[in-house]
Every structure is written in C-alpha cells, then in structure tokens.
Amino acid sequence: MARALADLSVNLQVPRVVPSPDSDSDTDLEDPSPRRSAGGLHRSQVIHSGHFMVSSPHSDSLTRRRDQEGPVGLADFGPRSIDPTLTHLFECLSLAYSGKLVSPKWKNFKGLKLLCRDKIRLNNAIWRAWYIQYVQRRKSPVCGFVTPLQGSEADEHRKPEAVILEGNYWKRRIEVVMREYHKWRIYYKKRLRKSSREGDFLAPKQVEGGWPPPERWCEQLFSSVVPVLLGGSEEEPGGRQLLDLDCFLSDISDTLFTMTQPSPSSLQLPPEDAYVGNADMIQPDLTPLQPSLDDFMEISDFFTNYRPPQTPTSSNYIESPSFGPMADSLFSSGILAPEMPSPASSSSSSGMTPHSGNTRLQARNSCSGPLDPNPFLSSEFLLPEDPKTKIPPAPGPTPLLPFPTPVKVHGLEPCTPSPFPTMAPPPSLLPEESLLSARFPFTSAPPAPGVSTLPAPTTFVPTPQPGPGPVPFSVDHLPHGYLEPVFGPHFTVPQGMQPRCKPSSPSPGGQKASPPTLASATASPTATATARDNNPCLTQLLRAAKPEQALEPPTMPGTLLRPPESPQDTVSEIPRARAFFPPIPAPTPPRPPPGPATLAPPRSLVVPKAERLSPPASSGSERRLSGDLNSIQPSGALSVHLSPPQTVLSRGRVDNNKMENRRITHISAEQKRRFNIKLGFDTLHGLVSTLSAQPSLKVSKATTLQKTAEYILMLQQERAAMQEEAQQLRDEIEELNAAINLCQQQLPATGVPITHQRFDQMRDMFDDYVRTRTLHNWKFWVFSILIRPLFESFNGMVSTASLHSLRQTSLAWLEQYCSLPALRPTVLNSLRQLSTSTSILTDPSLVPEQATRAVTEGTLGRPL
C-alpha cells in the first residue's frame, strides 16, 4: 500500500502555484502550498519573541469571497491597494479598545470583520507595543498598557466593549474547550481525505530520524484553517458529514485533557487562563510562577514524615539456615521467642547447660542497597592499645565474634579467680552459637560502673584465629537505638585507632560468606577521623531511620575473663570507654546456676547464657533485646560480669505521636489561616460598595484590596468633612447663644404691670384679626408669625393708663424692640419657626392649605 501511494505521488504532476494578482499580501511571493518546503523554495523568516504565527495567513481567499456581496466576477480580480502603514488596522484597534490595554495576549476582535492576516498583524503590533513599554522602557506610539493597580488610570480600560472583547464574561465550559480542540485535531484528516478525493495526494513525507522542520509542520497544520472553519462553495454538500467526531477522532489518542488536569490546589486558575494550551494562545504566561502552599506543605511533610523504603535489601553475606525469616509481628507485639536448642546441642553432652536461651533477631536494614563494609566504624575503641594484650594467632577455624581483652572501667576491682573450671562444649554447637553471637554486636560495649563478679556458667573451647591481624566483628545489622549515642555529630575516633574494614569474599563450595570484619589499627596513632565523614551509610541510617525501629538496649549478663599475668592492666587501661556510654548504674541480673565442671585447655572461649527479658505489659512497642557475650579467656580464670547501661529508648512512639500532632496542628492552623483570609475577603466584598454592587463579578484579591483602600480613603475624607461641618455648627451655636445673652441683658429689669385679663383679651383680639385676614389672603398668616413677637412685647410693655405713659412706653418699646439690631434675631426666630412648622422649604405649594388649617383649628402661634 505504501509503495502504491508513493508511486501515485510520483506520477501525479502538481503544477507550481503562482500568487494570484488579487493577493494583497505584504510579503514577497509567499506560496501557501504545503509542498513549498519540500521543494526548498521556502525562505526562513525571523521570528521575534511574541510573534503570533500562522503558516499561510494570506491564503484566505475563501474568506474574501464570502465577505464580498454578489457573484464573483472577473472585475473582482483586479489589483487592490495595499496599506503599508497599518492605518486601517489601528483604527480597528482603537474602535475595539478605546482605552488602554491590560495584557498582550491574543485578541480575536469579536464584532469586527477582520481577516486572519489582519488579526495576526494587530496582535503582533500589540505585543510589540507591550515589549517596547515594559522591556525597552519606551513609550509606544501604537497603544499603551496599564496594570489594575494604577489608581484612576485603571478605570480607563474598564469600558464595556473592552471587557467583553477581552473575554472576562465568556461562559467557558470544558465542552467548549474540547470542541475547539477537536476542531484543531480534525483539520489534517479532513484535508487528507479531500486531497485523496481530488486525486492529489498531499500526505506529508515521513522524515526519518525525527520530526519534520517546524516550518513544514506549521504549514501542514494551518494551511487550510479558514476554509475548513467557514466552509465555502468549493466544499462538497456531504463534506460536513466527514466532521463526525466518532469518525475522525476514533484513532486519535486524546491525551490533552488527561495531561493538563489541574492538580488539587487551593490556588485555582482564573477564568482568563482557561484557554491555556489552545492553538491561538501560544504566548508564554506566568502560570508556572504562581506558588502553591500545598506543594510546600507536601515538601515539608516529606522531610518530617519520611520513611525509608521497606524493600528487602541484599546483604553482604548469605544467611545460614539457622537464621530463618522472622515475621514482623515479632517487633510489633514486643515478644521475642526464644530459640529452641538444636538436636546436636540437646543430645551432645551429659550434664552441660546448652546455650538455648539465645534470642535471634533479624533486624531490618534502613539503608537502601547493600552496606558497604569500608565506611563502617571500627570497634577498636574497645580494644586496648597495648599490643601485648592482643590474642596471638593460632591455626584452625575462627568464630565470628571472638572478643578481645575487655577494657578498663571506672571502679573495677581485680577479681578473684573463678572457683569453677572451664567446660568444653561439643564441636557441633560452636558454629551456630558463634553465628548467633555475631548477629548481636553490642556485647563489646563498655559496662557501667556497677559491676558484679559472677562465676562463668558456660565455657567453650576457643577457636584460634587463622592468622595475625584482624579481629572479626560483625556490624551488619545494627539497631538504630544504639547509633545515636555512639555516632553522634561530635564523636571522634580516639587517636591511635583507625577504622579499617576488610570486605568479605564468598567462600567456595556453597558455604556462606563471612560478614565484613573490622581489623585492629596498625597505622600511625595520630590519625583521627570523624564517624560522620567515614560513615555515609550510618549517617543515612541516622537521618532516615524509622522511629519505630529504635529498640531498647539489652540488659545482658556476661562473663569476661582476664589474663592473670597482667593484673596492673585492670586499673590502668583506657577509661575513655565512658565517652561512648554514660555511666548509668544498671541492676545486676540474678546469677545463673553454675554447671558441672569439665576440664579444658588453658585458653578457652567463654560464652555465657544470655537472659531474655520480657517487655512490660504497659507498652507493646517497647522491646528489650538480649544478646550474647563472647570473650576470650586467657590462661587464667578471672570472671567478671559486666552489664551495659540500661537506657530505655522508648521515644519511638512518643516522637511519632509528637510528629503527627505537630503535623495535624500545622494543617489545622493553615486551614484556619486560609479560612480567616477568605472570610476577610468576603467581608470586604460585603462592606465595599463598589464590590457589593456586583456580587457575581469575580475580582482578584489585589483589586479587592485596592478597592478597599480607595473606599477607606473615601470614608476618611467624608468623616473629616462631617467633623469639620459639625465644628462649624458648634461655632455658630455658640455665637447665637452669645447674641441671645446679649439681647436678654438689654431687657428692662421690671416689665409694665398690667392685668392678666387685659393681656388675654388683647391676644384674642389679635387672633381674630389674623383669622379674618388669612381667609382672604394666606400670606397674612405668614406675616402674623413674623409680627407676633412684636405684638407680645408691645402688649407686655406699653401702658395705656394715660397718654403720657402711652407715649413714653411706646417710645421705649420702639427703641428696645423695633430697632434693627433687635428686629434681626426676632425675625430670624420667627422664620425658623415657620420653616420647622410648615413645608415651605420642601413643598411650598402646601403652605396655603397649612395656613388655612392653622387659623381654623386654632393652632395660631404653635407649630403644626
């Protein structure tokens, strides 16, 4: 099939496409054919940053035909005028965006009939203007940009047409996005089928060894964008049925919406970023730069709650059948099952006490991968520096854990020789017991000052070492509870002791390989090395170990025999072993029953019976481990029982609970903080009038804070204005009170003595006169309000006893009440009463009715 298609493509003669005369392209001879790049005629174009690209934007002849009204004639193919200055396009830009722009992202100019080429040119001009303004720091002559937080200028771009055209009010749904995406996916298939129907096979040639060039790929994707979207007259009537998604997308693996699913985060993308990844939106954005607090919490949780992988790690040696797999329930329940004695040990000797109480532990390793034997810390701090006390070599097989001469401890007195002779065990028991001793490497730790002497319960025949030099010591499975006090950050290997390791090699014949051994130092005594620098694996164990694996150190009875030929070494040996374990007094366990005596060679190996301690019933996670203590007995029978410090390391579960509580507290505090922030922003939305007026509009937090600050500033200005106005009113009140007091001081001390009956009669006569005149003209009632204070003062001051008194009191009344300084406050009070008792200020048309009602209802002189 491929050969036939290739022959078809070779045999078909495709004429060269020449630009038509009606092409108003602003570039030189751009060929829209997708076979342009194959012929080598395509010129490389310089693409700057932010260049919106479509391969053939000038091949939209179908769009021009659709825009033209009426049939297409020969006269329509004449030359057209080209506008190289972009004047018409900038007019369209000014029409769509009358204010300033906010972002240089792609704009479709909805509502304007623009060609695809013109939209690209406009968007390139907009992007270039943004580049000139913000990168080159120059003023762009085309258009300007503003940020939402630039004060009064921020409202310039908030015009309705700009907001709608920018897409802030688009109802974007995932179905719309998927539909647009599917349109882009079916362009190539539709063009391929159309070309195959016309007999022109336009399938792109397969480029061997990688993708085709970018220009060719873009041409293949975008060469027929506009015809496919709009569908012209050249398309077949049934061609739209080929756009069936089931038909076109059946063999296309749609991975866009599975790869771009947003991660569960509190920072949701704004609506403007819903089209990230669309073919139109090829501009870079700032979405990857938005921080996520949840990611930071996950990273912090990784450091606080990190657990090493529980995958089984390969060891440096093959375990023997005696080390069977032990279930994890041994650690979870806290109960250690004692090992049953082997048949060889149970039936070998008559009357000897077999080493049947040993507890086998299969410690889990926290270090991923096999442990490198080289960086392990040497156990030479337990070896004396005196080379004379070292064990001389002897031929024969070697046990896994022969102990050197014990170190000196504070308060250790020389012990008396043991009254019990040594015993020789059967040979079949020694390898298993040695292996069991090697599995627990803590027996050589220096004991506490409290030391008690015990007779040796069990003694074995020593197995000499095969050669001079190293003393084997297994540190393969080291519980993490012992690592922290020994290998601290400030721990330094004592001078004269350098850790050296010999990697073990597997023994031939299918036998198990020996674990890595530690040799005694033979180098210069001035060499000093820190445990952290020489121990990368132990450092990893310290940093990444589980808290649950921190086990309690065992409390073990042991028997260490010392050579009688050097009694002075008992007190003069190195006391620096106290630096590794603090001198905590430990209780002395009960004496084991001594077994029957059996003669043995003078230099023998003593393996005491290890006691198993049951865990306390209150905590199932605390585990007490017991181990074996092997030591070399020189030619002498000094028996000393040493007990290591009993430090109960039960911090595993406590630290775990504390860490979990801290994590929960941190999460709850973070949730509370976020809820308070959200509640605060919701409160601001309700308080600020500009935000509460449009509750459906989604506003960013920065805009919310800016609007809130502006609203607070406005409230402060209004409050200052109100306070200033209130102060002015207070000043006016004080001035009025002062004027009133001044007027009152000018009144006479005693008024004219008149009868009360005469005063009431004059008032009734005045009311009757006012009523009569008001019914004829309502304005007289307003005049009566102004003249009533003068009438009251005249009625109270003028005396009619005689003409002389009438003249005198009338002149006095005129001077006192009718002068201009006296009339002003009186008229002012009358006008105030008129304004408060009637609606002359709010609705003057109601004043005649109110005046008539006042004189008819007898409310003259009183507020309505």
Curated annotation (Swiss-Prot):
Region called Leucine-zipper, residue ranges: 715-736
Compartment(s) of residence: Nucleus
PTM comment: Phosphorylation at Ser-566 by AMPK inactivates the DNA-binding activity.
Keyword line: DNA-binding, Nucleus, Phosphoprotein, Repressor, Transcription, Transcription regulation
Modified residues (Phosphothreonine): 27
Region annotation (Disordered) ranges: 15-41, 53-77, 332-397, 449-468, 489-533, 547-570, 583-602
Chain ranges passing through the membrane: none
Top-rank lineage group of the source organism: Eukaryota
Bias (Pro residues): 583-596
GO terms of molecular function: carbohydrate response element binding; DNA-binding transcription activator activity, RNA polymerase II-specific; DNA-binding transcription factor activity, RNA polymerase II-specific; DNA-binding transcription repressor activity, RNA polymerase II-specific; protein heterodimerization activity; RNA polymerase II cis-regulatory region sequence-specific DNA binding; RNA polymerase II-specific DNA-binding transcription factor binding
Comp. bias (Low complexity): 513-531
Zinc found in the keyword field: no
Skewed-composition ranges (Polar residues): 351-368
GO BP term (any one): negative regulation of DNA-templated transcription
Major subcellular site: nucleus
Tissues where this protein is expressed: Expressed in the ventricular and intermediate zones of the developing spinal cord of 12.5 dpc embryos. In later embryos expressed in a variety of tissues.
Entry annotated with the keyword DNA-binding: yes
Domain bHLH intervals: 661-715
Phosphoserine, modified sites: 20, 23, 25, 196, 566, 614, 626, 643
Subunit-structure text: Binds DNA as a heterodimer with TCFL4/MLX.
Function: Transcriptional repressor. Binds to the canonical and non-canonical E box sequences 5'-CACGTG-3'.
Name by which UniProt lists this protein: Carbohydrate-responsive element-binding protein
Organism listed in the record: Mus musculus (Mouse)
